[in-house]
């Protein structure tokens, strides 16, 4: 009810018809909202600094992704709230991912090639190797019970990075 009230209070609605909770969302809650015959997705979530999740970055990247044609239009945002156009779609299952790799890979390539050119502002980095290093330091500095996996994980990360960097035209430098 608290989330529904938050959604209802947003100043963008003309004739709010329905709010439906959507499954999924690892670090946020998602809702499908019907308003005046159109549908939007409302994402509610806060920053999670220990996991390098900053909602302000989602806004910057969402705008860039929309500009290159791989994401819905950002309709509205405020702290903790992101509203996007709804796109009728189906969540891919592992089998459908495998069956459609020839369509998926070019989209991922486009994301990595074109989004960096469209970014504005100063987004925090969410680069996989930096994140691994960050988590490693976090485990060390907080005397984590998971510290035993740390050195093995760092070694694997360095090996993967080195392999990727050795590939021609690598975009993950």
Where are these regions (language model features)?
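An alpha-helical support segment within catalytic cores of ATP-dependent transferases
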Residues: 1-14, 116-173
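Short secondary-structure junctions
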Residues: 14-22
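A generic local structural motif
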Residues: 6, 17, 27, 59-60, ...
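ATP-binding pocket architecture of kinase catalytic cores
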Residues: 21-127, 131, 144
């Amino acid at each position: 009810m608290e989330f529904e009230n938050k959604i209802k209070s947003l100043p963008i609605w003309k004739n709010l018809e329905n709010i439906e909770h959507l499954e999924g969302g690892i670090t946020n809650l998602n809702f499908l909202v019907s308003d005046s015959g159109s549908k939007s997705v409302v994402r509610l979530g806060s920053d999670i600094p220990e996991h390098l999740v900053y909602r302000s970055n989602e806004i910057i990247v969402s705008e860039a992704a929309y500009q290159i044609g791989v994401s819905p239009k950002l309709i509205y945002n405020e702290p903790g709230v992101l509203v996007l156009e709804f796109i009728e779609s189906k969540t891919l299952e592992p089998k459908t991912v495998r069956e459609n790799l020839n369509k998926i890979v070019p989209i991922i390539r486009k994301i990595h090639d074109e989004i960096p050119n469209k970014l504005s502002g100063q987004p925090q980095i969410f680069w996989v190797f930096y994140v691994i290093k960050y988590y490693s330091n976090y485990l060390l500095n907080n005397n984590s019970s998971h510290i035993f996996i740390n050195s093995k994980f760092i070694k694997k990360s360095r090996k993967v990075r080195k392999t990727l960097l050795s590939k021609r035209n690598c975009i993950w430098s």
